[in-house]
Amino acid sequence: MAYLLLIGTRKGLFTARSEDRRTWEPNGPHRLDEADDAGMGPVYTIGINPHSGRLLAGTESRHFGPGVWHSDDLGATWTEPAEAPIRFPEDTEASLTRAWQFAFADDADTVYAGVEPHALFRSTDGGDGFTLVRALWEHPHRAEWFPGAGGGAIHTILPGTLGAGERSPEAITVAMSTGGVYQSADSGASWAPANRGISAGFLPDEEPEFGQCVHRVAAASDGSFYAQNHHGVYRSFAPATEGWSRIESGLPTDFGFAVVAHPHRPESAWNFPVVSQEVHLPPDNRLSAYRTDDSGATWRAVDDGLPRDPYFGIVLRDAACTDGADMPGFYFGTRNGDVYATTDNADRWHQVTAHLPDVLSVRAVEV
């Protein structure tokens, strides 16, 4: 097998390939449009359609604004539709700032896009065109959602699950900053918050119905969830509407951005701690990843192969992932431009590439 890693950075898209996930051949930056420098600005998110292999990239140009590009040959060539695929209807009086997340349903054609400002779009043609999910945009809570420090956006989309034992094709779970977790059981026709137990220490009511600054949610293989909140790491063992439990005991801090669930073992996940909301540095200025194999009851640092010298780059919410292989690989990139990989049967990280621009998004696939 071969493995493809896609790395979205502050200055364009980079890739890397490997046969063994230990040694890598990095490449880039890639011009998405060979005629000019399109795509050489930020690449905020990347999506890989597991059914068709189509790649989607959410970009931003200082001159042309936000863009969505797609590739049907694993990144060899890229196309931008003639008309913007994500457009707010005129009556909303809103405009796209950028795409934050792409997610794929169980069929090859249905794609979701989470964007800034807080909105969810759906495509039924593989990502060529998207339609606003009106019920979430028109939710009565929306007037009280507000931007987090990075902006106001839907950054997590998890089709097909509402929590453990709650899988269905009509289910969708989303998370946003700042607003919290919302779920739909009817393909987006109606939505309800699912934040019970998640704190919002910056609000007068520290456990409100909604308004939490959830940084990331990851779905485990049984449909249950892990969440990295603005403060606190959480697990939802039952349907998320029944509540969340804190699981950060054993981690050096309760703050961070990224969390990755094991694709086959629901008790296993990765977390990447950050000192605090004021200090965006790794704890003790040392780069490390933490793993649980018991649903957060305990955590252990996995830092073999990572820098021993003082390190100051952190992992952003979209910059860690798994390739989903039978023997899964796990990957992360930092704001210092370094990217690392490991496999489930190893406790050592291998450097994929170094000294890239600020890493914003990482995606991997077995090809």
What are the residue ranges of the model-derived segments?
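Extracellular glycan-interacting surfaces
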Residues: 1-367
